C-alpha cells in the first residue's frame, strides 16, 4: 500500500489541508492519506491552548466523508513532544511493507535541517513538499541541507530527487487555496464568517464548543 502522511497542529483543520491531501493522493496514487494531529509540536507553541482531543475531533469530522482519508491519534497516545522521526518510525514498524509518503509544506521542508534526526527521514520514506506557485524541483534541490545534498540526484524525467536509499523527494504544485488556521482563529474571535474556509461539520463544532473565541 502507498500511504500518505500529513501531520500538523490542525488548529483548526481547513480546506487547504484537505485539498493538499487530495491532490497528493490523486497525483501520487496513494491508497490512503493518514492525518496525524500533533500532541505537542516541538517547533511552535499551540495557540489558544486548544486540547489535543478537540483538534483530533475536528480532523475526524473533516475527513469523515472521504474513504481515502483516515485519522490517527498516535502522537497523543505516545505523549511528549511530537517529533516527526518518532512518528515515521512507528508507522514503518506498523506497516513494514507499505511505501510511506510524508507530506510537508515548503516552509517546513526549507527548515528540515532543524528537525530531530532529519537525515533519517529520507531513509524511512518518500517526501512530498508542497510548493508555492512558480517553484520548481530545482528550487527544492537548493533547499536540501548541505550535509545530505550529495545523497540525492535529480531525475528530470520523473521530476523528483532520488535518494540513495531508494526513496525520493517530490514537488507538489498547484495547491492555491490561501487559507490559514491563524486567519480562521482571528475571524472567529472577531465575529466574522468562516464559512467555506473549512468543512461545515468543523465550523459547527467550533461554534458549538465556542472554540477560539478568546484565542489569537
Curated annotation (Swiss-Prot):
One GO MF annotation is: nicotinate-nucleotide adenylyltransferase activity
| InterPro entries, alphabetized | Cyt_trans-like (IPR004821), NadD/NMNAT (IPR005248), Rossmann-like_a/b/a_fold (IPR014729)
Tell me which Pfam families the record gives.
CTP_transf_like
Which chemical reaction does it catalyze?
Answer: nicotinate beta-D-ribonucleotide + ATP + H(+) = deamido-NAD(+) + diphosphate
What keywords are assigned to this protein? ATP-binding, NAD, Nucleotide-binding, Nucleotidyltransferase, Pyridine nucleotide biosynthesis, Transferase
Q: What's any GO biological process attached to this entry?
A: NAD biosynthetic process
Listed as disulfide-bonded, the cysteine pairs are none
Alphabetized SUPFAM superfamilies for the sequence: Nucleotidylyl transferase
Named in its record, the pathway it takes part in is:
Cofactor biosynthesis; NAD(+) biosynthesis; deamido-NAD(+) from nicotinate D-ribonucleotide: step 1/1
Identify the EC number(s): 2.7.7.18
Q: What does this protein do?
A: Catalyzes the reversible adenylation of nicotinate mononucleotide (NaMN) to nicotinic acid adenine dinucleotide (NaAD).
As for family, the record states: Belongs to the NadD family.
Looking up HAMAP family in the UniProt record yields: NaMN_adenylyltr
- Would you tell me the protein name for this molecule? Probable nicotinate-nucleotide adenylyltransferase
Q: Which gene encodes it?
A: nadD
